Amino acid sequence: HWLTYRDRGTLEELWPMVRDATDFVLALQQPRGEIIWARHADSTPFTFALLTGSSSICHSLRCAIAVARELGHERPNWELGAARLDRVIREDPDAFAPKHRWAMDWYYPVLCGVIRGETGRERLDHRSEAFTIDGWGIRCVSDRPWITAAETCECAIAHLAVGDRAGALRLFGWAQRLRDPNERYWTGIVVPEEVNFPGGEQ
């Protein structure tokens, strides 16, 4: 919103929420740098961190830091937390619950800007065969024939983030097969049967 409209009033209005949410999240950061996935209803933390979630958090922390700087608030602990999280995502995959079958763990570190440039392109290339069905898109899970619009389009953005425009356009083009006549996207499809999954969900 800020980058598009330069609406400082909205930025100031949202600041207390951004501040409190960021502090809440960083309270779940572990000594290695990973951030625990959630808290239970009684406020005790879960026992594991997720790579996809932590990648998204890393991007959100950078945005929160940018908001703080724009409003003149110093938050060195946020910058330290973001740096620690960035490092553990890039260097210590064992810090996260094993979710290797899921496509989001494959491309989210690239999508969220943690793994960039040639290293990011290599990461996308490395497991592309496991998750890509030519002409359709990206499997949600590597050993299941479920193609989803969300994973396909997110992975397209990840390709764009590392300069692979051709790969991004190819994936986005495939995703159009999941659009209905009203221009809405089906959540996913099972191939080769071409059955929408979950049934009827858009």
Report residues per predicted region:
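Specific register positions within alpha-helical solenoid repeats of the TPR/Sel1-like families, i.e.
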Residues: 3-6, 62, 69, 111-114, ...
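Extended ligand-binding clefts on enzyme/binding-domain cores
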Residues: 12-62, 67-153
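Aromatic-rich carbohydrate-recognition surfaces in CAZymes
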Residues: 1-30, 54, 168, 172, ...
